[in-house]
Structure formats: C-alpha cells, structure tokens
A protein has these predicted regions:
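A "functional boundary" signal
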Residues: 24-214
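Bacterial N-terminal signal peptides that target proteins for export
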Residues: 2-12
Length: 214
C-alpha cells in the first residue's frame, strides 16, 4: 500500500510540475532543467528514505536512467548512497559516493560542484560515524561545511553544523561542540527554521553544558 501511495504522490507532483513548466516556457520566462527535475524528485522521495530505502534505491536508479545532465546524475548518486546507508550496505554507499567524487574532481569548479562536494563529504562523515571513525567524521563534516559555504545552496548549513558539533562532542572536544551548536542556532535563525525542528541543537547544547559543568 505504501508503494502505491508513493507512486500516486509522484504522479501528482509530476503533473503539477509539468503544468507549471509549460505555463512558464510558453511565456518565455522559464525552462525546466534536469536539476529542477531532481529537486522535484528529491522532495517527493525524501520522506521514504528511512522508511523504505529499497523503494528509494529502485526508484532512484530508474530516474538516473533518464538523466542527461552530469551534475544532476551525481546528485542522484549521492541520494542513492544515502539509501544504501539506510540499508547498511556501506560498500555500495561508498561506491556511489566515489563515482560522484570522481566526476567532481574532473569538473570545472563552480557553486553547483561545490554543493555536490558538500553532499558527498557530509555523507562520508555520516558513514564514518556509523563505522566508529570519529576523527575522520570531523574531517569530512568540516570539508562539507567549507564546500557548502562556497556553494549556491546554503539551506543545509545548520544540519552540517549540527553534524560537526555532534562529532566534536564524540571526540571529547566539548568547547568546539558548543561553538558549532551555537553556529547551528545562528543558521537556524537566518534560515527561519521552525522551533520544533531545532530540538537537536537545544538538546546537544544542554548535554555539552552538563559535561562542561561536571
């Protein structure tokens, strides 16, 4: 039943997006890009990532077969890596990230490529966390943050800041953890993140202050 619901949801998104695209292109103001299609797909599929990673893998592989833009294709690869991680298939996740990174290494530097690097290193950091490689996770998250600053999409800076804070806390660097939690709060303010989504930051700060007090 869940898969049927997701299919109908995707069809509905597709119809709305096509109507919007036609109306915009007919007036000569907008033409749909492969990255637009990816972002539409990402918004549709992201809620299923933790609930049904098998479905995400299958559906994403199908989407990739229709993609002609290399940057969009690599974003699909990173999304595929996330799904593999939820399936605990770390080797497959690493392979997908490696393929995306090889493309980035050979591409002309640009904000879009920096966004892609940020996605890759944030994912690598998460994989390191799962494998208990705490110091390596700090390095990866720091690279993800630096690339995101040079990218075109800063909406995820608060998430990467939280990841960095968590990683520093795991290494026992509570002062650096507190600093990154405060940075995360600052980004939450600038991005107007709702209060109910800031709980990880408040919880992390509370834990750090308890550790520092002891």
């Amino acid at each position: 039943m869940e898969n049927i619901h997701l299919i109908f949801k995707f069809l509905w998104y597709s119809i709305l997006f096509c109507i919007w695209g036609v109306s915009c292109t007919s007036s000569g103001t907008y033409k749909k890009t492969q990255m637009d299609i990816y972002m539409q797909y990402y918004d549709f599929i992201i809620d299923s990532l933790s609930k049904n990673p098998n479905y995400v893998c299958t559906r994403t592989a199908r989407q990739m077969s229709f993609t002609t833009d290399s940057v969009a294709y690599c974003h699909y690869l990173v999304l595929l890596a996330k799904a593999y991680m939820f399936k605990s298939e770390m080797d497959s996740a690493k392979l997908s990230m490696d393929r995306a990174e090889v493309f980035c290494d050979g591409a002309e530097p640009s904000p879009l490529i920096n966004d892609l690097y940020a996605e890759i290193y944030n994912m690598r950091g998460n994989v390191c966390v799962r494998q208990g490689l705490t110091d390596s996770s700090v390095v990866c998250f720091q690279k993800a943050f630096d690339y995101r600053l040079k990218g075109s999409n800063r909406d995820m800076l608060h998430d990467i800041s939280i990841n960095l804070a968590d990683a520093f806390v795991r290494t026992g660097h509570y002062d650096k953890g507190a600093m990154w939690y405060r940075k995360a709060l600052s980004y939450c303010d600038s991005l107007k993140i709702p209060e109910e989504k800031r709980f990880p930051v408040y919880y992390g700060l509370a834990q750090v202050y308890m550790e520092l007090r002891d």
